[in-house]
Design a protein with these regions (language model features):
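A structural microfeature
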Residues: 28, 61, 148-149
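N-terminal Rossmann-like dinucleotide-binding module
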Residues: 1-40
Length: 306
């Protein structure tokens, strides 16, 4: 089957590698434009572009698919199927209808749950026990197409979104490769989504990463896991200093006021409900450190307020 691949970040690059390894015919790759990266703003190619060029596949990087005759260019490439993984551009109807088998998308949630750009993170933020991957026949809506295949994935209660994303990527690449032969054979039954059960997973921001020590310990624990590695959950101390928390654990409390230091080895703080051990933190303007070192730097003792 002649495939045109569309994708941009690491998850898409891993899926593209899997397609090459499975022997699929990738006629072309579409990805986003190179972007300046880092302090020196070095122009850097998307991961997908690097993989495609390493395999000698033509790469296209249009600003949008809605103008400039890109639909005609895609038709000229004559793909039988378009595979989309985190591309970052809306596909117009003219592109959706171009291939014989249409366009499919790998979405890293169990649709219709968590439609949008950050499904893995929101599964962790909400303390879910499981998530999954879905292969969807694309339509003009946002993650609203019929589901062709899916697989559930258990979430470890201490797992960060970054750790989960690595596992989800591997499962997604495998399920994608397993689904393609069935698409070509016409043996898959597309299941319409239960749109009334849909939820969204909006993009994360640094502002929404804030939590308060008056929140419950479970909420803080999930927030820290879900915001790791980016943007990093944070709170403001009683002294007005911003502290990013990269790892914590839920601990017991005995009714102390939120923010009260219960212990310093490890640094344990009472919350609105329960308590948390702050294991790894990044104080504002400083390097990462363990919670005990942070407490020592502030000369905190049990009974103090953080």
């Amino acid at each position: 089957m002649r495939i045109l691949f569309m994708g941009t970040p690491d998850i898409a690059a891993d899926c593209l590698k899997a397609l090459y390894e499975a022997g699929h015919d990738i006629c072309a790759v579409y990805t986003r434009r190179d972007k300046p990266v880092g302090r020196k703003q070095v122009l850097t190619a998307p991961p997908v572009k690097e993989v495609a060029l390493a395999h000698g596949t033509p790469v296209f990087q249009p600003r949008t698919l809605r103008d400039g005759g890109e639909d005609e260019n895609i038709r000229a490439l004559a793909p039988e199927l378009i595979v989309v993984v985190a591309y970052g551009c809306i596909l117009p109807r003219s592109v959706l209808e171009a291939p014989k088998y249409g366009c499919i998308n790998l979405h890293v949630s169990l649709l219709p749950k968590y439609r949008g750009s950050a499904p893995v993170q929101w599964a962790v933020l909400n303390g879910d026990a499981e998530t999954g991957v879905s292969i969807m026949q694309m339509d003009e809506g946002l993650d609203t197409g019929d589901v062709l295949a899916c697989e559930k994935i258990a979430i470890d209660p201490e797992e960060t979104s970054g750790q989960l994303f690595d596992r989800v990527t591997a499962v997604g690449a495998r399920v994608l490769c397993e689904t393609l032969p069935a698409i070509a054979a016409g043996t898959l039954k597309a299941e319409p989504q239960a749109h009334e059960n849909a939820s969204t997973a909006p993009m994360l921001s640094k502002e929404m990463a804030e939590f308060k020590l008056t929140d419950s310990a479970d909420h803080i624990h999930n927030w820290v896991r879900g915001m790791n590695p980016w943007p990093g959950a944070w709170f403001v101390t009683a002294g007005g200093k911003k502290v990013k928390v990269m790892e914590c654990r839920v601990a017991e409390s005995h009714g102390e006021a939120a923010g009260t230091v219960l212990a310093t080895k490890p640094l344990t703080v009472a919350c609105g409900e329960g308590a948390v051990q702050l294991l790894h933190v990044v104080p504002e303007g400083k390097k990462p450190m363990d919670g005990t070192s942070f407490a020592a730097g502030l000369r905190l003792k049990a009974g103090n307020s953080l």
